[in-house]
Curated annotation (Swiss-Prot):
Protein name: 4-hydroxy-3-methylbut-2-enyl diphosphate reductase
Active site per the UniProt annotation: 127 (proton donor)
Binding-site positions, isopentenyl diphosphate: 41, 75, 125, 257-259, 306
Family: Belongs to the IspH family.
PANTHER family attached to this UniProt entry: 4-HYDROXY-3-METHYLBUT-2-ENYL DIPHOSPHATE REDUCTASE (PTHR30426:SF0)
GO molecular function, one term: metal ion binding
Gene name tied to this protein: ispH
Pathway noted in the entry: Isoprenoid biosynthesis; dimethylallyl diphosphate biosynthesis; dimethylallyl diphosphate from (2E)-4-hydroxy-3-methylbutenyl diphosphate: step 1/1; Isoprenoid biosynthesis; isopentenyl diphosphate biosynthesis via DXP pathway; isopentenyl diphosphate from 1-deoxy-D-xylulose 5-phosphate: step 6/6
Positions of [4Fe-4S] cluster binding: 13, 97, 229
Amino acid sequence: MKINLDRTSSGFCIGVQGTIHVAEEKLNNPDKLFSLGDVVHNEAEVNRLEHLGLTTIDESGFHELKNAQLLIRAHGEPPSTYRIAEKNNLVITDTTCPVVSRLQRTARLLHELGYQIIIYGKPSHPEVIGINGHCKNSAVIIKHPDLSDPSETGQIDLKRKTALISQTTMDVPGFYELKANIRNLFAADSEEIRNENDHLWMAIRDIDLTASLTGIRDMPRYVYKDTICRQVSSRNQMLHDFAIANSCVIFVAGKKSSNGQVLFGICKAANPCTYFIEDIDEIDDAWLTGSDGRTVESVGICGATSTPMWLLEKVAAHLQRRYNHDPA
């Protein structure tokens, strides 16, 4: 059986790499380091870092923490976190992903300009909670691009000027599907919008925000900014092709990983013989056996942006020992 390990489109994204690198450096120091929430949505990697000395705390633990070192993970945090940290005399090491930081700034400026903010994302995701905090927790969060959830659409004020942005790890097609459906929702409520073309929903850049804030020119009533991380979204096609190229696919990710669920779905759609695991003890021998009782010709091992490469290598080594009788 040929074992193919995907080193191109799997493993930590740049934002997570930065967080892990900084955490490892800090853990070489004698001062205890605390992480607000799991440093990454992968239990095996969290366990590795905790073995090195990292302590993971939840919100209640954070409020009680005083005079300590605090790590802000790549997902970012709302402004309230920084205020509490200052009050509790916490020394912050901020590893918010630069892509997320720019998105937080965009959300804050759009809110200051009076826009109703719609975020394409998952309401409970840490990144979305952070973004929403930068617009004073006033954003409408939409998870379903087809607008099928009335509890989401019911929050949209059709009379307000509106800006659409996205969680950085959501899917690009879903974002543009949501944009089209929101435009139709507003158009159904307004004859003025029905009589206009798509330019009413203008794609904006940072320069447009600056121009509007400084009074050089105003932005349209309805705007959108595609804030999806292209380093993440570019993996979609590569993983699709990787899945097709193998008889069977073992997809490795943490069950909490939002990106993992999306990428697993892409692999599964490309190759129905795709299976999700967190670690090697979840591998079922039946997955790797063909209808003739022989092992499959090839197995591909891949994972999410929150999956460490060492874990993918561990899975590959396990399969090599078990199926190719390699003692290495």
